[in-house]
Amino acid sequence: MTSFREFAETCQAIEKISSTIETTNKVADLLKKVDVEELPLATHFIMSEVFPAWSGEQLGIGTSLLYSSLSKASGMSVRSIESLIRTTGDIGETALLILKEKRKNQVTFSSFLEEQPELSITEVYQRFKTASEASGKGSQELKIKNLQFLFNSSTPREAKYISRLALEELRIGVGEGVVRDAIARAFSVPSDKVEHAFMVTNDLGIVAAAAKEGGIEALESLGIEINRPIKMMLSQISPDIDADIRDMKGAAIEWKFDGARVQIHKNGNSVTLFSRKLENVTNSLPDLVEIIRKHVKAESAILDGEAVAVDENGKPRAFQEILKRFRRKYDVEEKALGIPIQLNLFDIMYLNGRTLIDLPLVERRKALESCVESSVEDSKSISVDEQVITGDLELVEKIYREALNAGHEGVMVKNPNSAYSPGKRGKNWLKKKPLMETLDLVVVGAEWGYGRRANLIGSYSVACYDPETSRFLQVGKVGTGLTDEQLKELTEMLSGLMEGGEAGGVFAIRPKVVLEIAFEEIQKSPNYDSGFALRFPRFIRIRDDKDPEEADTIQRIGRVYSQQLKRL
């Protein structure tokens, strides 16, 4: 087994590195050393996650529980720990300092270490897993007991990364891109083989183990599996949609629905539904499960579509209404009657044992149509999104206007010859929408309100994502456009994510919540680490169907800024 100390030393070394290439080399060195059985665990750990994102498993450890565990392990009061965190701004550095002080005061610590076996990566994982599975009476005590064991068994440096890992935020800037390249480097396999294996498994832990054990052949043997969701292909806004359609020499035009993305896995009579964030939402949508059972005539399939909340006339309701269905855990049947769903299918990635993602869209479309049966009457609950392949710009505009008149967002413009690229955003899927510019940004800081809103968070620091460094870069603050109800909802969502100091009522927020923000323009600014600032930002809606890594990137911020200059 590989010691957790070796993992912590790698993290410490990476923290001191600014070069992506050097970081990749350090991760590759670690992966080479780790036993193949532990490789999936180490791979996820280095990306600040305990469980694979697709698994649905939640660690469920908040800051208060972590502080209590550290308090019991060290003898320091929770209040003193919170005070120290306000100074350091980091639970990891705080744990390091506390355990250093404790060890210094333990005369017999050397003999303690001799008796105590080294923590392994597997031991840390098992303790986290036991804590995550605790429920019901006594569950908090069990969680604390397992974390306390880890702190008592660790060196100060190990405690630093155990505490950060408990909050799934190592702060070392290692994301999927770095790990993907590190796997290729560590096991001398082509990066495109690693990339494709990741696309079909959605699990770099599985990919790393396969590359180590069997090289290229093992990577090529990996494929899509039912009930292991893959990332959804993404679209981007085009600055010149007409030029893009001409470049495609005919594009596939589909309505763009203002609903919630859903990935459907069917295996016999069993149906599992996953949200855009790959959360299992099957129990919240029993009516959708029955619709799939009735109308999808395939033994096994993985489908992509959009679920739209509709009124009694089949007209689309607001986006927030469908999210109420996805979030629902109780009185699900009652909610289904109050907010009926229409499912619009537009792609298929797997059919009866065959992976389809490498096929062109036109062929996937035929496969989709062959396995979905619905009449005109059925189309109120399920349909294959109507598609027209054309290069006629006037016809595209006509379809676009029809979509808007029907209450939808606009149209999708797709390359008919494109493969399905899980998790990728590019020019093969473009969207045409009305011209109000918005960005999906992550909350990284906040400030309490004033007056009657003194008990609510009133201002939010928002950031874009840098996929090259896995960091979030601030682009501004937003405090307008929110109702009291929305302020209450956001305060509840963010209350468990607060960390760091509270000077002037300002505090840091762990990057978990995504907001859609409108703005007048983007300006260059030295005030934020992104180098940009939003002018007159205002809140539009919460995007809790998106993960932080799906937020708009620093590259998109730069593109929008450049496009503004061209319009001047």
From Swiss-Prot:
Cystine pairs: none
Cofactor: Mg(2+)
Enzyme Commission number, as recorded: 6.5.1.1
A Pfam family annotated for this UniProt entry: DNA_ligase_A_M
MF annotations from Gene Ontology: ATP binding; DNA binding; DNA ligase (ATP) activity; metal ion binding
Gene3D superfamilies according to UniProt: DNA ligase, ATP-dependent, N-terminal domain, DNA ligase/mRNA capping enzyme, Nucleic acid-binding proteins
Annotated binding of ATP, by residue: 254, 261, 276, 306, 346, 425, 431
NCBIfam families with a match to the protein in the record: dnl1 (TIGR00574)
Function in brief: DNA ligase that seals nicks in double-stranded DNA during DNA replication, DNA recombination and DNA repair.
Name the record gives this protein: DNA ligase 2
Species: Methanosarcina acetivorans (strain ATCC 35395 / DSM 2834 / JCM 12185 / C2A)
